[in-house]
Amino acid sequence: MASSNRHWPSMFRSKHATQPWQTQPDMAGSPPSLLSGSSAGSAGGGGYSLKSSPFSSVGEERVPDPKPRWNPRPEQIRILEAIFNSGMVNPPRDEIPRIRMQLQEYGQVGDANVFYWFQNRKSRSKNKLRSGGTGRAGLGLGGNRASAPAAAHREAVAPSFTPPPPILPAPQPVQPQQQLVSPVAAPTSSSSSSSDRSSGSSKPARATSTQAMSVTTAMDLLSPLAAACHQQMLYQGQPLESPPAPAPKVHGIVPHDEPVFLQWPQSPCLSAVDLGAAILGGQYMHLPVPAPQPPSSPGAAGMFWGLCNDVQAPNNTGHKSCAWSAGLGQHWCGSADQLGLGKSSAASIATVSRPEEAHDVDATKHGLLQYGFGITTPQVHVDVTSSAAGVLPPVPSSPSPPNAAVTVASVAATASLTDFAASAISAGAVANNQFQGLADFGLVAGACSGAGAAAAAAAPEAGSSVAAVVCVSVAGAAPPLFYPAAHFNVRHYGDEAELLRYRGGSRTEPVPVDESGVTVEPLQQGAVYIVVM
């Protein structure tokens, strides 16, 4: 075959170099049928021969003469590349003559040449996709191995003279990458494979750089968020007895001496630290409790100590949970007023003075935020004998004194019901009362012994089997009620009311009720119950 002899194109160039150019217009002006017939006869050789003219004899055609390969001109390659890039990868038979007529304006070409050019171009595209990321050298080797005719025509050299191309409307605008000269061919020839290789090697590089920039940008954006979270959530999990950490700056989340993280961008939205500092002026939100160590300076960390722990309702046991014992800002919405949300400064002094008596109360109430229940506990006068036994008291409409704090300790000490059992109540005998310290500081009405005597005097009037019930709401505590040891209707005080049994100290337990709001078990004799509204 003609493709196996690689020296034939050079022979063809030296033989026809002295021929005048006037023979080609005659060939171009010949009928297309003769050209197509001659090119069809030379299809086996893979090209068109200039010797096959309508004036040549049959004997000359039968002589085995080497037929040179068709070397496309740059203008013809531009037209073919434009058609290939438009989507016509494998043109049909009726379209090949039309393409050939366009190419003949720049030089001789046959139908077979057009057909094989598209076949080779399609093979080069497939090989380029297979070896996409191997680099420019790998792509060039893959294209040469896949198409031997394409490698052969790169070595051919076009004639030295090139006619000026006429002005024709191109199918598509010519890209500058397609005009690059192949490194193997002569300066006048061009190839699309070189441009494809150069463009293919540059595009993955751009994609890699873009991807690297995107990852870097994402890390830069996430680092301030990590710094802010680290600064704001540092206080969680620290014990109360440990010395407080140095408070960070209020107006700068990231200190200037720690350039590890980027500065948080400025925005019109204030953070929680800035908002609290602007409203409260840098003060602590809860009252300072006296402690052996000197108090730390107010700052952003101490301001919001225990602000994030929010519980909807108290747990079933009512005491000794992990969050409860830690005391990090537990906040109940409406039914835990008896659990120490309004602990006053005087009560804090009492608990600190008697740690061996009120350890559980102090551990339960440390760190609870003040929500307007009062700062000091005034004298609340309670008349135990005013309520008749077995009659439900009305819901307290008028609140207690405006600065009265409502806690389990204050309710029990005020009502003198901590030792309400019949065996323990005696006139002027409250020696075992663990809340006697409150009376020593003058925080309850009179002495507890007088209230205990009133309770002892009221118990025989109500009968031997009675229980004490104290109604507690946000407004304050109502006078105690002596109720018979029978079933108790909690719904009388509202659908949200709860009944707790007082166990002493700050310990309470919920009393189970049925669907109608009546206690499952009757009230125990001598027990103390608290209705939370």
Swiss-Prot record:
It is found in: Nucleus. GO terms for biological process: regulation of developmental process. SUPFAM superfamilies: Homeodomain-like. This is WUSCHEL-related homeobox 7. CDD domains: homeodomain (cd00086). GO terms for molecular function: DNA binding; DNA-binding transcription factor activity. Transcription factor which may be involved in developmental processes. InterPro entries: HD (IPR001356), Homeodomain-like_sf (IPR009057), WOX8/9-like (IPR044557). One of its GO terms (cellular component) is nucleus. Residues 65-129 bind DNA. Keywords: Developmental protein, DNA-binding, Homeobox, Nucleus, Transcription, Transcription regulation. Residues 161-174 have a biased composition (Pro residues). Residues 132-143 have a biased composition (Gly residues). Residues 28-41, 175-202 have a biased composition (Low complexity). Its main location: nucleus. SMART domains: HOX. The gene is WOX7.
